[in-house]
Amino acid sequence: MRKSYRVKSEKDFQQVFESGNSVANRAFVIYKVEKPENKHFRVGISVGKKVGHTAVARNRLKRYIRAVIDEEKLEIDPQVDFLIITRPYARNFDMVKVRKNLLHALALAHIIEEMPDEVEEN
């Protein structure tokens, strides 16, 4: 995922955090703000120390999240900035669990239309 797809500055993070709508599941909180002037979506990822006590664990989760976003970028609404805040419940997730829970949260936030069939719960 290129850097132009990331919310990076503190000002942009605060803007999305303060003026955005939020939805959550057990593993992730999503803050979303509509930006009609955007050419493509931007995402910010936050994995706190309560989630992973080592940098290795936190970076692994961020890498998994970025991989899911990269795989699903054609499905994501291009006129939105959103933040993904990871909760401690996701501490020991593997790639499959991150994908399933993140797509569920993105569908709740209406950032993607619906969960792909291969990850839906029965």
Curated annotation (Swiss-Prot):
UniProt protein name: Ribonuclease P protein component
Catalytic reactions of this protein: Endonucleolytic cleavage of RNA, removing 5'-extranucleotides from tRNA precursor
Description of how the protein assembles with itself and partners: Consists of a catalytic RNA component (M1 or rnpB) and a protein subunit.
PANTHER family linked: RIBONUCLEASE P PROTEIN COMPONENT (PTHR33992:SF1)
Organism: Lactobacillus helveticus (strain DPC 4571)
Enzyme Commission number(s) from the entry: 3.1.26.5
Enzyme class: hydrolase
Key words, A-Z: Endonuclease, Hydrolase, Nuclease, RNA-binding, tRNA processing
Molecular-function annotations in GO: 3'-tRNA processing endoribonuclease activity; ribonuclease P activity; tRNA binding
Annotated TM spans: none
